[in-house]
Amino acid sequence: MITLQNVVKEYTSRNNKVLAVDHVDLEIEQGEIFGVVGYSGAGKSTLIRMFNGLELPSAGTVEVDNLLISQIRGSKLRKARQQIGMIFQHFNLLWSRTVAENIAFPLEIAGVRGEKRRFRVNELIRLVGLEGKENAYPAELSGGQKQRVGIARALANNPKVLLCDEATSALDPQTTDEVLELLLDINKRLNLTIIVITHEMHVIRKICNRVAVMENGKVVELGDVLDVFRHPQEKVTQRFVRQVTDSDETEELIHLLLDNYAEGKIVKLLFMSENATQPVISQVAKENDVMLNVLHGNLTQTQNGAYGTLYVQVLGTEDAINASLTQLRQLKVETEVLER
């Protein structure tokens, strides 16, 4: 659906050059929700603007739905952009137009008139849950409602791709979740390919199938969201994962556990979605004659499945403890004995 090959974006100002995007390769599939996460200055917003030709690469190619966006200009590019909707952090609504008129604006530009345009506007208002707000102006709307208008407007011309550039960054947590649920629903209903640019790992965890982590213009890590959360490889990825797993607090907790539970072994267990809800602990304890005390745990849900982390105290003979750890690994539970 979307292919980036060796994409570079370089800016020149007086005596220095800035490499905003540094030789990026990506393949994004039809119908997936793909996340790009990075801190400010990582290059993610520059990258997404090359998907619809708002920025042109200094080198490399950008292909969307078999069309080389990076090489077309003029009317061909304008036509291609009708198939690539975009929503923004600060909504970019026309403040002198009502909700219905804002949604109708791209249809006007595309030459859609009369009853056909009114029908499409009403259809989109229902899709994003803004019934009764048709004649309201942006100043009368909440932040979440404004973003719903932005989403409806972006979908007006039945695009195949929706670009979301920090679309929830200006919203409170509850409204963020409501907008994310709407994007999930739209993705499933329309089989729409959605690209999400964000610095919030909660957004990635909530709706994305795959994620690319950017730093200094490069994609430094790429994979299924569940895999990236389980085993983040790069330091920047580990920092992002800590946003939603409270790893800093867990480090303090580990020291407390090791200090307060001197007997047996303290073991960290990592459960995957297929065994996160199974009675593994009781089964292993019973079959190996050990006592497993659960000290701390959490469960994280992603679009690829759930994974859970448990910290347990294992009490028993040395042989029984080792046998229980072996059985846990056989049951596809990752184990890590914490050293005192």
From Swiss-Prot:
EC code(s) of this entry: 7.4.2.11
Membrane topology: Peripheral membrane protein
Any GO MF annotation of the entry: ABC-type D-methionine transporter activity
Domain of life according to the entry: Bacteria
One cellular component term from this protein's GO annotations in UniProt: plasma membrane
Domain ABC transporter per the UniProt entry, residue ranges: 2-241
InterPro entries linked: AAA+_ATPase (IPR003593), ABC_transporter-like_ATP-bd (IPR003439), ABC_transporter-like_CS (IPR017871), ACT-like_dom_sf (IPR045865), MetN_ABC (IPR041701), MetN_ABC_transporter-like (IPR050086), NIL_domain (IPR018449), P-loop_NTPase (IPR027417)
Cross-referenced Gene3D superfamilies: 3.30.70.260, P-loop containing nucleotide triphosphate hydrolases
Class in the EC hierarchy, top level: translocase
ATP-binding recorded as keyword: yes
Record-linked CDD domains: ABC_MetN_methionine_transporter
Disulfide bonds: none
Subcellular location: Cell membrane
Keyword Membrane on entry: yes
Binding locations of ATP: 38-45
Catalytic activity entry: L-methionine(out) + ATP + H2O = L-methionine(in) + ADP + phosphate + H(+); D-methionine(out) + ATP + H2O = D-methionine(in) + ADP + phosphate + H(+)
Entries under PANTHER family matching the protein: AMINO ACID IMPORT ATP-BINDING PROTEIN, METHIONINE IMPORT ATP-BINDING PROTEIN METN 2
Family: Belongs to the ABC transporter superfamily. Methionine importer (TC 3.A.1.24) family.
Subunit structure: The complex is composed of two ATP-binding proteins (MetN), two transmembrane proteins (MetI) and a solute-binding protein (MetQ).
Functional description taken from the UniProt entry: Part of the ABC transporter complex MetNIQ involved in methionine import. Responsible for energy coupling to the transport system.
Protein name stated in the entry: Methionine import ATP-binding protein MetN 2
Organism, scientific name: Listeria monocytogenes serovar 1/2a (strain ATCC BAA-679 / EGD-e)
